[in-house]
Curated annotation (Swiss-Prot):
Species name: Leuconostoc mesenteroides subsp. mesenteroides (strain ATCC 8293 / DSM 20343 / BCRC 11652 / CCM 1803 / JCM 6124 / NCDO 523 / NBRC 100496 / NCIMB 8023 / NCTC 12954 / NRRL B-1118 / 37Y)
The encoding gene: pyrR
Entry keyword Transcription regulation: yes
Record GO biological process: DNA-templated transcription termination
Family to which this protein belongs: Belongs to the purine/pyrimidine phosphoribosyltransferase family. PyrR subfamily.
Protein name (database record): Bifunctional protein PyrR
Length: 175
């Protein structure tokens, strides 16, 4: 069975724009706001949202990317290192963090990202933005900003394509 495209380029751009407007509304602009993208695709989505925030509000929002590999609960022997050098690490203490990822599924990636954020500082607030929420949560985690809810079967997968890596913007259900 072929993959089914559920978001094309235009739909993906509209979803990111909607998320951006919701972030502006919730945060009353961009004061004390930091966008944190979960590597790899969340990082690129965070940078795009920051660009839109600058276009709409005229403010530059800091963006940081985090690698949560060492905070995953299926790798208990890891040593909780973010792999960031001091130039890449932003001061997130007392900041309003918007954590950004491409797909929300079981919630385990987000749990690991929360652990990673707390490891480097004490944010004032943390909210979650995802391009796609596909359901099937294993942990009590809910996104504050969702581009598109796409219910899937347990055996299906969601594949997000971003221009920066894949040469196109799209979301597909993989059977």
């Amino acid at each position: 069975m072929p993959n089914k495209e559920v978001l094309d380029n235009a739909s993906l751009q509209r979803a990111l724009t909607r998320i951006t407007y919701e972030i502006i509304e919730r945060n009353k602009g961009g004061k004390n706001l930091v966008l944190v993208g979960i590597k790899t695709r969340g990082e690129y989505l965070a940078r795009r949202i920051a660009d839109r925030l600058e276009q709409l509000e005229g403010v530059q929002i800091p963006v940081m990317a985090i690698d949560i590999t060492n905070f995953r609960d299926d790798k208990p022997d890891q040593h909780n290192d973010l792999g960031l050098n001091s130039e890449e690490r932003l001061n997130i203490s007392e900041q309003n963090i918007v954590l950004i990822d491409d797909v929300l599924f079981t919630g385990r990636t987000i749990r690991a990202a929360l652990d990673a954020l707390i490891h480097i500082g004490r944010p004032k607030t943390i909210s979650l933005a995802v391009l796609v929420d596909r359901g099937h949560r294993e942990l009590p985690i809910r996104a504050d900003f969702v581009g598109k809810n796409i219910p899937t079967a347990q055996n299906e997968k969601i594949k997000v394509f971003v221009q920066e890596i894949d040469g196109k913007d799209a979301v597909e259900i993989v059977h």
